[in-house]
Amino acid sequence: MHSLFKQLVFFLVMTLTAADKAAFDAESMLEAPRRSAVVSNPLGNLGIFIESNYSFADHKYNSGIYLLNESTRNHQELLVHGKSNKALTWITDSAFLYAREDNSSSSSILLFDVNNRSERIIYNHNSSISDIRIGEKNNHYRIVFSSVDNSLVKGPSNVHVYDHLFVRHWDRWNTGSRNTLYFIELDKKTENSNYFEISSEKAIDLLKETGLESPVEPFGGLSDFDSNYDKLVFVAKDPKLNPATQTKTVVYEINLNTRNLKSLSTAKGACSSPRLAKDGNHIAWLEMQTPQYESDQNQIMVYESESGAKKHIARHWDRSPSSIEWGVFKGGEPGLFAIAENYGKQILFFVSIFHHQVIPMTEEHSVSSISVPKSSSLWLTKSSLINPPYYAKINVETLNESVLLENNVGLSPTSYEEIWFPGTHGHRIHAWIVKPESFDKSKKYPVAVLIHGGPQGSWTDSWSTRWNPAVFANAGFIVFALDPTGSTGYGQRFTDSIALDWGGKPYKDIELGVEYIKNHLSYADSEKMVALGASYGGYMINWIQGHPLGRQFRALVCHDGVFNTLNTFYNTEELYFSIHDFGGTPWENRVIYERWNPSNFVNYWATPELVIHSSKDYRLTESEGIAAFNVLQYKGIPSRLLVFEDENHWVIKPDNSLRWHKEVLSWILHYTKDCNANEDETF
C-alpha cells in the first residue's frame, strides 16, 4: 500500500508542464467548438446549427445558434443563450422552430425569423422538450414534439419501490417518468409572412393510456419518430415484454386526424429510424430479426399504407445502416439515403427501393447526419480522426462533394493512416495508426494499443472527445486502434463471431496486432507498449492481464470494464446483452461465463494497472472496478483507482474529462519512461 506522501508526489507530477504539452492536447480538444448536426432549410440555401464552447477558466459552456449560407459559405451567430437550445427545425425557408429550457421543470418552443432576426415564444410546456417534427397542409401546421411526462413520479420521498424491471437504466433510477410524444397545431396568418398562432388549447399526449413510451430510453431521440400533417410513425418497446430481457421495439402509426393507433412491424428484434415518404403512402424503417441481440443487422423495410404490403429492401447488402432518410437520387430515382459503417468509416449510401442497388456516395471521413432539402444537394455533418464535426454538401447527380464549413484544430492529414493485418480464421483485421504531429520516422516512440467497447463496435475515422487517438499520439505515442473479431462495419458474420467467444478470437487478433507492430512498424518501440480499453475494451484489459499478452505491456488502463462476467449479468440493467453474448443466463450456461471470466485468472495478474469507474454507471457497476483494484492491491501490483461520483459509463463533464486525461496520460507516460517498468519510483 502506497504512502500518503507518494500519492501526493504522484498528484503533483500528474499535470504535464507547459514545456511538455503538445500543440494539441486534452484541454485544447475539450475547449474546441462542439457542433450539432447541421439542418438545411427546405430550399437548400441556408443551414442552422448549434455551436458550444467550454471554458476551463469559467467552467461553463457558451452556446449559440448559427446560420450558414450555402452560396457564400459564411456563418453568423443568430442567438446566444445561457439556457439550453435544441431541436432546430425549419418551418419555412426563412423561419425555424427551436426548444429552449427555461428551468428544470419547463421549456418553450420558439420561432425565429431569419429575415428580421426576431424571435417569439410559440408554446410553453411544463417539461423539457427534446425534438420537434413539423407537418403542413394549406398553411396549417401540426407540430409533434418529444417530452417527458412526470405525472406518475412519486415524491418527495427518496424511497424507490419496484414490481418489475427496469429498476434503473443507464445512469438513473426509474422514478415513474416516461418519454412521450405531444401534438399541437399552428396556423400561418398570411401567405408571405412568418407569423404563426397556436390554434390548439394545449398539447395532446398522443401516447397517453397506450402503455407505450417513445423515444426509447436511454438514447432515443429524433430518429425514433417522424410525422407529416396526417400521420405520426414512431418506435416503442413492446409493452407485453420485459424491457430488460428483450430488445423488441415495434413501429407504430397514429392517424393524427382520428388518433387511431396501429402497429406496422412484426420483427422479433429492435426496430428503429421510422421514416415517412413525401407521398405519405410509404413508410421505411430499420429492423433486426434476432431477439435479445442489440447488434443484429439492421435490415431496411418499406411498408405501403394503402395495400398493407411490406418488403425487405437490398436483402443482399451485408452492412448494418444506423439511419435512413427518404430522397431522390440520379435521374429522379426515389429511394433511401443510408449511413452505415464500412471498413472503419461511416459512409453515406443510396439504396434503390425498386432495383435494390446499394451505391456508396462518400469515400473520406465519416458521415454522422444528413439533411435532405428539395434541391439536388444533401447537407452532410462529417468528422474524422483529425477534424471535429464539419459541414459539407454532396450533389446527388454528380456525387461531387464540397466543404461548407470547416472545423480544424491544427492536426495534419498525414498524421494517421489505416492498415490491415492477418487475423484469426483467415480474417483481415483493420487498424488505424495515429502518430504525433512532430513525428520523426528516424526515432522510436512508445505504443498505445486502444481496444474499443461494444464489443460490437469499431474505431471509425470520426471525432471523439472521450477516446481521441490524437490526444494520445500528441502526448508522444504511436496509437494502434484495431478492430478485432466482433467489430462492426466488416459484415454481419464478422460481428456475430464474438458471441460465446469474448476472450477467444478477439484476444488472438490483438496478439497478432502486437506482432504486426513489432514486425512492421520500425518507428514503434515494442519494448514500451501500453494497452487501454473501455467497457468491453476494459474487459479485454482484465482478460489480457491474466494471460501471456499482459506481460508484453508495461502498463494497462481499464475504464468501466468487466472483472467478473457472472456479477456483470446480475448487476447490469439490460440483461439481454449477456443473455445473447454468453448464450443464456449464468444458471443456464455457466460454463461460457466461467470460460471467459477474467476473475478466474487473477493468479497471473502482474502488470501495473490504472482502474477507472463511475458511480452512476449502471451498465457495468462500480463494484467491477473496485473488485479489480482490490486484487491488484492485495497482490502488491502497482495500481491506482479513479472514481467519478457524478459520471455514468462515459466521462462527459469537461472538468472530469480533463482530470481523466491527465490521470491516464500520466500513468502511461510514467511506465514508458526509460526505467524498469516494475519499479514504482513515482508512486
Curated annotation (Swiss-Prot):
It is an enzyme of class 3 (hydrolase). The active site is at S535, D617, H649. One of its GO terms (cellular component) is nucleus. Keywords: Cytoplasm, Glycoprotein, Hydrolase, Nucleus, Protease, Secreted, Serine protease, Signal. It comes from Schizosaccharomyces pombe (strain 972 / ATCC 24843) (Fission yeast). One of its GO terms (molecular function) is serine-type endopeptidase activity. One of its GO terms (biological process) is proteolysis. It is found in: Secreted; Cytoplasm; Nucleus. The keyword DNA damage does not apply. It comes from the Eukaryota. Its EC number is 3.4.14.-. Residues 1-19 form the signal peptide. Glycans are attached at N53, N69, N103, N116, N126, N400. InterPro entries: AB_hydrolase_fold, Peptidase_S9_cat. SUPFAM superfamilies: alpha/beta-Hydrolases (SSF53474), DPP6 N-terminal domain-like (SSF82171). Belongs to the peptidase S9C family. This is Dipeptidyl-peptidase 5.
